[in-house]
A protein has these predicted regions:
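Hydrophobic transmembrane alpha-helices and immediately adjacent juxtamembrane helices
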Residues: 1-241
Length: 241
C-alpha cells in the first residue's frame, strides 16, 4: 500500500513543483500507469529469485518448477488489487470519474500484461539459476525499461518527437499496456486547462493513438504473449532445476 503512495509523493514533488509540468490531475495519471508497471516489475523481481530462494524445497520435493515464478506473478497480482484501491481513492478525492467504452481496455490490457509478465518471469527465473548475476542485471534493465515506458511523463511528448520511429516505441509491450490503462482511467487525450488569469491552454498528455489501434495493439500483445508463455512453460519443464 505504501509503495504507490511513496511514488506518488516523490514524483508529484519533482514534476508538479520542481519542474512545473502542469499536468492536470497528475496523481490519477501517475497511478494509472504505475498500476501496470508495478505488477510487471514486482513480478519479475520476485520471479527471478523464486527458484534460487526455494532451493531446499526444489531439491527435496518434486513439483512443477514453473509454479514458483508463476506464484510470484500471483503475489504481485494481490499488490495490484491493493494499489487499485489507492487509485480509486484518489479518483474519488479528485472527483475524477471516467465512464465509457474506454474502460473495456482494462481487461484486455491486464490479460496481455499477465501473459507477458508470466512468460518473462519464467525466463528470468531460469536464467538466474544458471547465471546468478541475472537478478542484478534485471534491476538495471528494469530501470531503463521504466524510463522507456510512459509512466511519469506524457507519452504525447515522445510521440511528437520520434515521428518515423513510433513503431519502435509501440513495440514495447509494457508501453502498450500502460497506454491502455491510461486511456481507460485517465481518459482524455488532450485535456484543456484554465490557468490563472483566464488563459486557456490545451495540454497534450496521451499519445494520439486511436482507440481501434490501441485495441489491436493490446490484442497483439495478448496473442504474442500467450505464445511466449506456452514456449516458456515447455522449455522450463524440460530443464532440471
Amino acid at each position: 500500500m505504501l509503495n504507490p503512495i511513496l511514488y506518488l509523493a516523490v514524483f508529484s514533488l519533482v514534476f508538479s513543483v520542481v519542474l512545473r509540468n502542469g499536468l492536470p490531475h497528475f496523481p490519477v495519471y501517475l497511478l494509472s500507469g504505475l498500476l501496470a508497471w508495478n505488477l510487471f516489475s514486482t513480478s519479475l523481481a520476485m520471479g527471478a529469485r523464486s527458484v534460487v530462494d526455494n532451493a531446499n524445497l526444489v531439491t527435496k520435493v518434486y513439483f512443477p518448477r514453473e509454479i514458483l515464478p508463476l506464484a510470484s506473478v500471483g503475489a504481485a497480482g494481490v499488490d495490484f488489487l491493493t494499489q487499485s484501491i489507492v487509485l480509486v481513492g484518489f479518483m474519488a478525492a479528485f472527483r475524477y470519474g471516467v465512464l465509457g467504452w474506454n474502460l473495456l481496455l482494462i481487461p484486455l490490457a491486464l490479460v496481455g500484461l499477465l501473459l507477458f509478465t508470466s512468460a518473462f518471469a519464467l525466463l528470468v527465473a531460469a536464467l538466474n539459476v544458471q547465471y546468478r548475476d541475472t537478478q542484478h542485471l534485471l534491476t538495471l534493465a528494469l530501470l531503463v525499461w521504466f524510463w522507456l515506458t510512459p509512466v511519469v511523463y506524457p507519452s504525447a511528448l515522445v510521440w511528437a518527437g520520434i515521428h518515423r520511429f513510433r513503431f519502435l516505441y509501440l513495440a514495447n509491450p509494457v508501453a502498450d499496456v500502460v497506454l491502455g490503462f491510461q486511456r481507460a482511467l485517465y481518459g482524455v487525450v488532450s485535456p484543456t486547462v484554465v490557468h490563472q488569469g483566464g488563459k486557456v491552454t490545451t495540454i497534450h498528455v496521451l499519445a494520439p493513438v486511436s482507440l481501434g489501434w490501441l485495441v489491436m495493439l493490446l490484442g497483439a500483445v495478448a496473442v504474442g504473449s500467450a505464445v511466449m508463455l506456452g514456449l516458456a512453460c515447455w522449455r522450463f519443464s524440460t530443464k532440471d532445476y
